[in-house]
Design a protein with these regions (language model features):
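Alpha-helical scaffolds flanking conserved acidic
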Residues: 109-113, 137-139
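Short alpha-helical functional segments enriched in proximate histidine and acidic residues
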Residues: 48, 123, 148-151
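A short, highly charged nucleic-acid-interacting micro-segment common to nuclease
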Residues: 26-36, 134
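Active-site scaffold of zinc-dependent metalloenzymes
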Residues: 68-109
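Zn2+-dependent metallopeptidase catalytic core
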Residues: 35-54
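Long, well-structured alpha-helical subdomains associated
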Residues: 2-25, 32, 152-159
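Post-HExxH zinc-binding segment in Zn-dependent metallohydrolases
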Residues: 134-159
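Active-site recognition of the HExxH zinc-binding catalytic motif
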Residues: 114-127
Length: 159
């Protein structure tokens, strides 16, 4: 079962009773290359996957962000208790130039896209009511990061 294409969510969202789709909210100070890569990747995802309840993605120019639990992280997913409240994702991209310097442009962009994929996997776990332990959730998110990045890589030469 591919949780990105699983339709368990239909019992909640099939009546068009919520806003749908994925929306990027990118800070003006986010570098052009990161902005471009995220927009292209999001356009590709919209064609390939369903987003039955809107998932805003807040893209920050800082190196880290604070999660709701107070942890300082690179990316986070807010999972509401109510299935009709929109979740959201926040991603920090301020370490792009350091990643580019150490790993190269393509790997730096892939790392940022990977963070988005990881958090979107948590979105799909949430909408499809996938019950796993915390370790299981993270393992699954890490696995799907590689799977989705691999699918995307087949469609272009560079991220």
């Amino acid at each position: 079962m591919n949780i990105w294409t699983c339709k368990r969510w239909e019992k909640y969202y099939s009546d068009n009773n919520v806003r749908m789709g994925i929306r990027l909210r990118i800070e003006k100070t986010v570098t052009f290359e990161v902005r471009r890569a995220l927009k292209e990747f999001t356009a590709w995802m919209r064609k390939k996957y369903s987003f039955p309840i809107r998932i805003p993605v807040y893209v920050k120019s800082s190196e880290r962000i604070k999660a709701r639990d107070g942890d300082i992280v690179c990316a986070t997913f807010f999972e509401p208790d109510d299935k009709y409240v929109e979740p959201y994702i926040k991603i920090a991209t301020g370490d792009y130039f350091e990643l580019e310097r150490t790993d190269g442009r393509d790997n730096a962009l892939a790392a940022i896209l990977g963070s988005l994929i990881h958090e979107l996997t948590h979105y799909y776990q949430w909408i499809n009511c996938i019950n796993l332990t915390e370790v299981g959730r993270e393992r699954q998110a890490n696995a799907y990061t590689g799977i989705i990045l691999g699918e995307y890589a087949k469609t272009r030469e560079h991220p």
